[in-house]
Curated annotation (Swiss-Prot):
It comes from Glaesserella parasuis serovar 5 (strain SH0165) (Haemophilus parasuis). The lineage of its organism: Bacteria, Pseudomonadati, Pseudomonadota, Gammaproteobacteria, Pasteurellales. Belongs to the universal ribosomal protein uL4 family. Keywords: Ribonucleoprotein, Ribosomal protein, RNA-binding, rRNA-binding. The gene is rplD. NCBIfam families: rplD_bact (TIGR03953). Part of the 50S ribosomal subunit. One of the primary rRNA binding proteins, this protein initially binds near the 5'-end of the 23S rRNA. It is important during the early stages of 50S assembly. It makes multiple contacts with different domains of the 23S rRNA in the assembled 50S subunit and ribosome. This is Large ribosomal subunit protein uL4. Coiled coil: none annotated. Residues 43-70 are annotated as: Disordered. One of its GO terms (cellular component) is ribosome.
Amino acid sequence: MELQVVGATALSVSETTFGREFNEALIHQVVVAYAAGARQGTRAQKTRAEVSGSGKKPWRQKGTGRARSGDIKSPIWRSGGVTFAAKPQDHSQKVNKKMYRGAIKSILSELVRQDRLVVVDKFEIDAPKTKVLVQKLKDMALTDALIITASLDENLFLAARNLYKVDVRDVQGIDPVSLIAFDKVVITVDAVKQIEEMLA
């Protein structure tokens, strides 16, 4: 199959990478796993066993008129332990390499079908100026875009840093969440070739 390159001839690409069927279930599983892996999982609370304090019975069982009480660390007391205390845990989910690659291919194929993948020969700016990048995107009628280059362009990266709906990545830095988060994905010809090699 062929992808249309802006201001140039069409680029011949692999059908298996850019012409796959949309696999919603696979993409969902990989995106959920990716988001789960980003969780810190460091939250922690103390149970009644871990709270500092005496284990002595505050008052005798009967005869005071007050509610019976075993120790001051009871969860129903102020400053007591938490009943079902949260503990640090690893939220990461296993995703096979084949599944991950399949999800990326499926997303790229859907971007092509929806005309959201914009292939350009090169995407460069002369200076790390946000104003310059905004104008370049404006000329292409883009406001919300992920820019993928073969290697990370420092000028582009610095210029896009302060733009809310623009991000710059190299091929190694792409992930399923970023690919579906933007209205358009601008990708260079060299980056397309790299992705094909990476996902082959």
